[in-house]
Amino acid sequence: MKKKIIITGGLGYIGTELCKLYSGVSWHHNITVIDNRFISERVNQIRNWNMDFIQGDILNKDLVNKYIKDADIVHHLAGVTDVPRTKNESSTIQDEKIKEVGEKGTQNILDVISDKCKIIFPSTHVVYEGISEVKTDIKEDEDTKPVLSYSSSKAVNENQLKKSGKNYIILRLGSVYGYSSDSMRIDIMPNLFSKIASQNGTLKLFAGGRQIKSLVPLIDVARCCLLYTSDAADEDDSVD
């Protein structure tokens, strides 16, 4: 049976890879990509894959109501990705934008989707960034302790989903890395290290290189997002 599938933030790092995976089945479903940017090469490719593209913002309630209201599946990937990594990098304007897009945008979607719609939301491992003890195996029921605006907004999003009564899946992702033919996040550690090494540069490690970093390949994240669209997948769940 044809399903109506929405991908918000579909021109982004994860969204681009997810669209590629959907390209093999896009003639069997009604797939719409929503993004507030217009990147002509990616938009043309999406349309060639028989997907619709809508340039718009999830803060626009009328747009959300028009295109998302009767969705069967929503991959909610939209959000601000240019975020501060330390308190010194933070600014009030940037923090407010992260909060507005993340929290108001998510609520706009939750307000219009049906209880039968499955919403798949990528959260982040940095919701644990305030934990002082170094842990290598954090369980899903561990209390979150966000510090910066990005992780704080994601923690709020998780609570929005849990209280919504909707059919949701939360994926607490590690730092997503890897090459995509359409996009490349050079600000991500493994990608940056690969670039430096390919140019015979020097990698500088501080604190003796003892830091622990959670990493997950881009393609695995996209596959996971697709996997959880299955009717057999767990519902109302958080997965680390």
What is the predicted function of each stretch?
Residues I7-S23:
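N-terminal Rossmann NAD(P)H-binding glycine-rich loop of SDR-like oxidoreductase domains
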Residues Y228-D240:
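Single conserved hydrophobic/aromatic residue that forms the stacking wall/gate
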